[in-house]
């Protein structure tokens, strides 16, 4: 599976151009992309990172990490996903960086998602849906989720996001209308971010098959 991730990541380098400032996500597939960025002869101006983990990795390769507030709109954002449906709608947040990932995706002209073939699904929801929550609202949000959906929220104990919040993973969902569910869950007081990327889905999905396939 690591080879599939590497193929997807290296294919994404084809979309990187000299002098770009690019958004960079978080996760095992993105780690391959950062390594490929470090090897490519293309020279970018810098990167906006979605996590402390990716920031450290980018700096190891000598890539300058910039603040989104200082860069404006980005031409390109590259990130992975936990699930991807045929319409390029995603579940993300397994690495607990969903809020910053969603912000950077919204700030980018093109969002390229890189995945291994196992991440493709017909309907989102088999992978538990991560939701970032203000700590004091954890129980309230969990009750609201159970009242509004058939899902079972589970606190991801011991995990604190880079923003100082907690994660609820919602199990046993069958998400037939991701845009609607994203909107509904975002309305619960205490919810910071829902790990559904449906309203702002990927523009392009690179699947690390042999050879890589573009969705």
Curated annotation (Swiss-Prot):
Positions binding substrate in this chain are 26-29, 79-82, 92-95, 119
Q: Give the domain of life.
A: Bacteria
**Enzyme Commission numbers on file:** 5.3.1.6
Q: What class of enzyme is it?
A: isomerase
Active site: which residues?
A: 101
Chain's role: Catalyzes the reversible conversion of ribose-5-phosphate to ribulose 5-phosphate.
Q: Which family does it belong to?
A: Belongs to the ribose 5-phosphate isomerase family.
Name this protein carries in UniProt = Ribose-5-phosphate isomerase A
Q: What is the lineage of its organism?
A: Bacteria, Pseudomonadati, Pseudomonadota, Gammaproteobacteria, Lysobacterales
């Amino acid at each position: 599976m690591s080879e599939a991730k590497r193929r997807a990541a290296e294919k994404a380098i084809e979309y990187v151009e000299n002098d770009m400032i690019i958004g960079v996500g978080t996760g095992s597939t993105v780690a391959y992309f950062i390594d490929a960025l470090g090897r490519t002869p293309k020279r970018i101006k810098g990167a906006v990172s979605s996590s402390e983990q990716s920031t450290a990795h980018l700096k190891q390769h000598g890539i300058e990490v910039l603040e989104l507030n200082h860069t404006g709109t980005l031409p390109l954002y590259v990130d992975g996903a936990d699930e991807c449906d045929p319409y390029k709608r995603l579940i993300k947040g397994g690495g607990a960086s969903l809020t910053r990932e969603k912000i950077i995706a919204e700030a980018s002209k093109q969002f390229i998602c890189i995945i291994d073939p196992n991440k493709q699904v017909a309907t989102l929801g088999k992978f538990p849906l991560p939701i970032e929550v203000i700590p004091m609202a954890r129980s309230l949000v969990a009750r609201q989720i159970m009242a509004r959906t058939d899902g079972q929220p589970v606190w991801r104990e011991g995990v604190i996001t880079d923003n100082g919040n907690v994660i609820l993973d919602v199990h046993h969902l069958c998400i037939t209308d991701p845009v609607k569910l994203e909107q509904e869950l975002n309305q619960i007081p205490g919810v910071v971010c829902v790990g559904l990327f449906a309203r702002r889905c990927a523009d392009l999905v690179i699947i690390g098959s042999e050879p890589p396939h573009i969705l």
